[in-house]
Amino acid sequence: IVFHESKSLTREVITKNTKPEPNGFYGNSKLQAENGLHKLDDEQFRVVILRPPMIYGPNSKGNFMRLIKLARITPVFPAYHNKRSMLYIDNLCEFIKQIIIREKSGVFYPQNNELADTVEIVKYFAKAYNHKIFMWKWLNIFVHIGSLFLNSINKMFATYYYDPNMSIYPFEYIVCSQEKSFEYVLNNNEDK
């Protein structure tokens, strides 16, 4: 479920009290499906709704891989720091395993222990690929201007994360730290 469509670079923290605001037919249909599934939950049939943030791993599709590619080729990057919730695929798999073992039901918000920062991700992969990149604050004005016209800029630079307390459960599911997961992605990507 998309809680809402980010149209600005304002800081957004999702809490357990945040009401879903689907941004279109797809998001609305997912919310309706969730509401219908909740009605089926009982002792014989457990319903689990997972609302993970961006999931990443080796050879994953989407924005994370685009960010890695950018880190390999761009000579400059805005020093525009943010916070983002992310979830490594192995951590998601462990979370699902623990939910099944414990026969849990409900709505869950798993995420890595660490919040990600777009600038730090780009720095990490640029260094790993031995690529010189300059991070300049004066480029931040272009982030602000671009965010008015391009949703992709908002997706890359907006601060948007789950309250870390939402992701604490009575079982361990973080099998790989964020830094180790980046290392694993680096060493196991087909596009090296």
Where in this protein do the model-derived segments appear?
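Conserved donor sugar-nucleotide recognition element shared by glycan-biosynthetic enzymes
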Residues: 29-30, 60-64, 85, 118
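Flexible, glycine-rich beta-alpha linker
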Residues: 3-4, 48-66
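Residue-level signal for the nucleotide or nucleotide-sugar donor/cofactor binding architecture
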Residues: 24, 84-87, 116, 173-176
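A hydrophobic C-terminal alpha-helical subdomain
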Residues: 140-179
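Catalytic helix-loop patch of NAD(P)-dependent Rossmann-fold dehydrogenases
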Residues: 8-49, 54-55, 76
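Mid/C-terminal beta-alpha module of Rossmann-like enzyme folds, strongest
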Residues: 95-153, 182-192
